């Protein structure tokens, strides 16, 4: 009997939105050029634009998409070239008839009028033009970044777009990494996708990290909202709302514990409260048929304003995560990244320098740890 293939939308790239009004570059009345890899093949593409966390009206005056630098196809919104989204709104484009093969690259061009204040900063190839609409212009009209900006600006702001989807009959695992800056910075998410696919596990690893994000509470007033809404609040949108999602990695809690300033904060942001939040999200994910991986919190002794009381809560939370039976698997990032002589600190080669965020080498080690937990294999090429 011939097998009938069923096409469905699969997210090949996404980002969780936060307020980016303090992030550079500024896209006011400029054009964005974003290029992302397509991990599946298909005949149609659609994009999702968002102003969920913006504080100004989003105006797109023209957009287009192409494959591997080829001819650009117009992007329409209900048949129209322009889009206006008020604060809190998001929408899909019309379906775009565009053949894409797995391994090719999709480029998205969008010209804005006025400020753009909703987006994020994750690892992706994005460029910002000089003032004007350059949707159909050659690359030479994109603003040239200075040597220093190109060298240091590894995570420039990515405005407005929140998802790229391909209509396909392929069935890869789609894993959403739900976390904070340690996820957002992409040091472990990018190598994890490569390792899983090299290991014979077709997978798309999506980054739903927001820098400074907390599980239980939204951004403190002092953070100018760039730290985003509480993960508990954004879970439906940023995990369950992702087309094709099959699994989630929860890597949250370090900022809840990191904001503990007085004894009474432990009740609302300590290990017990964070673990209860993780259990609640796990139950919701399981209801939707998702596999849930929970990550332990990496060491951070020596980081700014980190106290022995906070470290005690981190250790308690990690012990709860390791011993809990509610998660499908546990990814022990804490063990993978810890210094051999002092488990409360990141290993020297895993430390980016602030004693909190992993280096590129640290991210590689965390990715190997995640791959081992997810596949049962502890060798990168296995």
How would you label these PLM feature ranges?
Residues 167, 237-243, 283-284, 377-382:
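Surface-exposed acidic, glycine-flexible loop patches that form ligand/cofactor-binding
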Residues 1-178, 184, 190, 197-201, ...:
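N-terminal secretory targeting modules
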Residues 161-164, 171-279, 303-306, 357:
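Conserved SGNH/GDSL esterase-like catalytic core that processes O-acyl groups on lipids
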Residues 252, 296-297:
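A cross-domain feature marking catalytic cores of carbohydrate-active enzymes
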Residues 258-260, 297-382:
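Catalytic His-Asp segment of secreted/periplasmic serine-dependent ester chemistry enzymes
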Residues 278-289:
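Surface-exposed amphipathic alpha-helices with a cationic face
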């Amino acid at each position: 009997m011939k097998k009938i293939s069923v096409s469905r939308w699969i997210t090949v790239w996404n980002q969780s939105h936060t307020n980016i009004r303090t992030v550079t570059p500024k896209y006011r009345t400029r054009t964005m050029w974003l290029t992302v890899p397509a991990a599946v093949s298909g005949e149609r593409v659609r994009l999702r634009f968002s102003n969920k966390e913006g504080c100004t009206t989003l105006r797109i005056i023209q957009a287009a998409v192409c494959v591997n630098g080829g001819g650009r196809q117009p992007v329409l919104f209900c048949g129209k070239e322009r889009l206006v989204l008020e604060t809190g709104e998001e929408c899909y484009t019309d379906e775009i008839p565009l053949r894409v093969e797995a391994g090719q690259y999709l480029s998205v061009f969008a010209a804005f009028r006025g400020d753009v204040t909703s987006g994020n900063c994750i690892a992706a190839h994005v460029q910002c033009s000089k003032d004007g609409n350059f949707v159909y212009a050659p690359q030479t009209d994109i603003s040239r970044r200075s040597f220093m900006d190109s060298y240091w600006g590894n995570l420039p702001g990515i405005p407005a777009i929140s998802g790229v989807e391909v209509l396909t009959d392929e069935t890869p695992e789609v894993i959403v990494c739900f976390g904070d800056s340690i996820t957002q910075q992409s040091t472990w998410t990018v190598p994890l996708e490569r390792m899983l696919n090299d290991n014979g596990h077709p997978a798309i690893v999506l980054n739903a990290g927001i820098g400074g994000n907390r599980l239980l509470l939204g951004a403190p007033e002092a953070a100018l909202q760039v730290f985003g809404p509480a993960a508990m609040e954004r879970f439906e949108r940023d995990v369950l709302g992702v087309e094709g999602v099959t699994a989630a990695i929860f890597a949250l809690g370090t900022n809840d514990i990191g904001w503990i300033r007085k004894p009474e904060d432990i009740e609302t942001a300590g290990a017990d409260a964070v673990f209860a939040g993780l259990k609640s999200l796990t139950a919701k994910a399981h209801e939707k048929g998702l596999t849930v991986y929970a990550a332990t919190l990496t060491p951070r002794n020596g980081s700014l304003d980190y106290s022995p009381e906070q470290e005690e809560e981190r250790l308690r939370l990690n012990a709860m995560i390791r011993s809990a039976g509610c998660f499908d698997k546990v990814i022990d990032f804490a063990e993978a990244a810890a210094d051999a002589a002092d488990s409360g600190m990141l290993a020297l080669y895993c430390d980016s320098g602030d004693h909190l965020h992993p280096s590129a080498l640290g991210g590689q080690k965390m990715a190997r740890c995640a791959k081992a937990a997810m596949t049962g294999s502890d060798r990168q090429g296995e």
